[in-house]
Amino acid sequence: MSGSSPIHVVGGGLAGSEAAWQIAEAGLPVVLHEMRPLRATEAHRTDGLAELVCSNSFRSDDAALNAVGLLHQEMRRLGSLIMRAGDANQVPAGGALAVDREGFSRAVTRALEAHPLVTIAREEIDGLPPASWDSVIVATGPLTAPGLAEAIRGLTGAESLAFFDAIAPIVHRESIDMGVAWFQSRYDKAGPGGTGADYINCPMDRAQYEAFVAALRAGETTSFKEWEASTPYFDGCLPVEVMAERGPETLRHGPMKPFGLTNPHNPTVKAYAIVQLRQDNALGTLYNMVGFQTKLRHAEQVRIFRTIPGLERAEFARLGGLHRNTYLDSPRLLDATLRLKAAPRLRFAGQITGCEGYVESAAVGLMAGRYAAAERRGRALAPLPPTTALGALIAHITGGHVSAEEVGAPRSFQPMNVNFGLFPPLDHAPKAPDGRRLRGPEKAQAKKRALTDRARADLAAWLGEPGLPAAAE
């Protein structure tokens, strides 16, 4: 490989933006190719890099007890642009890290535009990248251009898998009736930049809840195209009406659970179910309906969601929608450094690899950028410890999944959020300071602390090993 020719990154989402940043910070030229605004998608609204098209939440920021919070911490340690921009544009969200989506995208775009080693090319790559590009990271996400997707299928000899992601509505804050609704985080928990009163809560009694569930189940939804009909949903982003169809109590044990919340307007009466809205921009003028991603037709959304107490006069800045997500059978197709086995000049990053979630996509982009930078310099990165959040995620994508052949039954690789189930087990169960065995919640919490403590120690050791690109110093 030539040391002077640029590395190419296709796709300017979270993964591609992070990959390009890591390469440039390692002192190497990189070209970031983004097809917007020349070609729009059904989910994006702007031409900004790293646009958030679904939720504005990066989920929990608790690095001691939560796997995604640990991933946040590891990415910050490795100089993540996505985490830097997220921290600089956070909005209150209880125990979660949520961001002002426009400010976040603007910060990422400006940082990459200002970097002397980054070139942003506004063009579509609708097919295999030219053979002269000897190092390419494909980070085209769930909306990969059809020509490129077909070219990838041709290389791999396999059909890509796909599922649907549904998008939640956003409501204008001033249209919410705060004589009915109230501010409170679940269990009054204050997260990064939060106060413990970061969500707007809309209560329902049993009759209201049952009528709402019935309306969701009867609501008219968008129809599927023939090629979409057999595409499964990802369980972490189910449309609210699909959850309603799974059972009458599913929603009140999911996004509408009433636990940890007290209605100050009527404190002696416990709500049967509660709809929560989370701040969506820094000004606090927009709130998104938590867990209310939907494929209902727009008119149905307005009609049904205005039956929620407090939202009777709701004005919607954006209604919910639906888009298709395509991803690879990565454990079979990719090597340990995210290269396509059939064409090693191509690496993959982000949702197309089968990770799920903004932070996970950016994390895979971060490592793809580092792998590409090390390879360009003729070095090999030491394998990530699978005990770290980054290592556990990469290991799952590139080989940790149990294949159908191994279990003797049909089983497909599915998108995965980072979670402690991906981490190797502890050598010894944690014990209390006095040596006694722990049980119940105390045991679970101690186990999580032990896993995150081990991860921090192992990442520190990995960062001290030779052969890392400059961006990791």
From Swiss-Prot:
Subcellular location: Cytoplasm
Location, primary (coarse class): cytoplasm
Catalyzed reactions per annotation: uridine(54) in tRNA + (6R)-5,10-methylene-5,6,7,8-tetrahydrofolate + NADH + H(+) = 5-methyluridine(54) in tRNA + (6S)-5,6,7,8-tetrahydrofolate + NAD(+); uridine(54) in tRNA + (6R)-5,10-methylene-5,6,7,8-tetrahydrofolate + NADPH + H(+) = 5-methyluridine(54) in tRNA + (6S)-5,6,7,8-tetrahydrofolate + NADP(+)
Location of the region described as Disordered in the Swiss-Prot/TrEMBL record: 425-452
GO molecular function: flavin adenine dinucleotide binding; tRNA (uracil(54)-C5)-methyltransferase activity, 5,10-methylenetetrahydrofolate-dependent
Residues where FAD binds: G11, G12, G13, L14, A15, G16
Cofactor: FAD
Any Pfam family matching the protein: GIDA
Residue stretches of biased makeup (Basic and acidic residues): 428-452
Gene Ontology CC entries for this record: cytosol
InterPro entries on file: FAD/NAD-bd_sf (IPR036188), MnmG-rel (IPR002218), MnmG-rel_CS (IPR020595), MnmG_N (IPR040131), TrmFO (IPR004417)
Top-level taxon in the UniProt lineage: Bacteria
Enzyme Commission code: 2.1.1.74
Keywords: Cytoplasm, FAD, Flavoprotein, Methyltransferase, NAD, NADP, Transferase, tRNA processing
Gene Ontology terms: biological process: tRNA methylation; tRNA wobble uridine modification
Free-text function comment from the UniProt entry: Catalyzes the folate-dependent formation of 5-methyl-uridine at position 54 (M-5-U54) in all tRNAs.
Family: Belongs to the MnmG family. TrmFO subfamily.
Protein's UniProt name: Methylenetetrahydrofolate--tRNA-(uracil-5-)-methyltransferase TrmFO
Organism for this UniProt entry: Methylobacterium sp. (strain 4-46)
Lineage, top ranks: Bacteria, Pseudomonadati, Pseudomonadota, Alphaproteobacteria, Hyphomicrobiales
